[in-house]
């Protein structure tokens, strides 16, 4: 009985994890993030500064660019603009968009 309970618990965790990953992909979140938090851009901010200094390299420059649909110039952001910051990134992308 204990083995069955443990197996059932492990399977339910695997199903929930798969559903979360599918939901994140559906939302278009990079780095296998599970959610986002808002950040209001300040004068002089760049994606590099936000990713490396403010969020201590817990998110990549390109993760920010992809999440916020920033085009060819990943540092083209404006003071007052609200960016979504992916949280709980499993991998960090600092180069694919540059």
From Swiss-Prot:
Binding site for chitin: 44, 48, 75, 77
Keyword annotations: Cell wall, Disulfide bond, Secreted, Signal
Main location (coarse class): secreted
One GO cellular component term: extracellular region
Signal peptide: 1-18
Keyword Disulfide bond: yes
SUPFAM superfamilies (alphabetical): LysM domain
Domain of life of the native organism: Eukaryota
Disruption phenotype: Produces no to only a few pycnidia.
Residue span, LysM domain: 37-85
Subunit structure: Forms homodimers in a chitin-independent manner through interactions at the N-termini of Mgx1LysM monomers. Homodimers are further polymerized in a chitin-dependent manner.
Family: Belongs to the secreted LysM effector family.
Name recorded for this polypeptide: Secreted LysM effector Mgx1LysM
Organism name: Zymoseptoria tritici (strain ST99CH_3D7)
